[in-house]
Amino acid sequence: MLRLIYYLALAAAPAAAQTQDARFFDERVAPIIERHCLGCHNEELKNANISFVDRESLLHGGTRGPAIIPGNPARSLLIAALRHEGELQMPPGPPLSKKDISVVTAWIKRGAVWGTRLHKETTPQK
Ligand code: HEC
């Protein structure tokens, strides 16, 4: 019996981590994207041919190629843009707060797990 419980716990662990990461996205990351990025990168406008409404769009990326490499923020174009490290600086104008940048960085490091808050039907906030 104990052994059964042990195996059940093992099987449940990855699912729990996934849920936790999805919640991290919905509560911490999605609000940043909604507020600062979605106005220009949505299904209608697609600035630089990239929309931020789902994970696939970011993995596929825009005219420059993939915007995020899950697990590897240092090689993710999106992070370089947020940090104003290169020619591409996002959002245009003043950079995000250090805290917001670290939240997005942590999210990519943890595998860039998506939640339910942003999807194809999400419309940008006016
Ligand atoms: C005011 C409109 C606007 C906002 C807000 C904005 N972007 Fe952009 N974004 C653009 C434009 C325009 C380009 C194309 C720039 C270029 O090609 O030089 C672009 C390009 C990009 C690219 C490169 C895509 C590619 O493959 O060429 C990334 C990544 C990106 N933005 C991320 C973001 C992120 C992350 C945010 C939010 C923090 C954001 N953008 C907010 C207008 C915007």
Task: Give, region by region, the residue ranges found by the protein language model.
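Sec-dependent N-terminal signal peptides
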Residues: 4-13
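Aromatic- and Gly/Pro-enriched helix-to-coil junctions and flexible linker segments
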Residues: 15-126
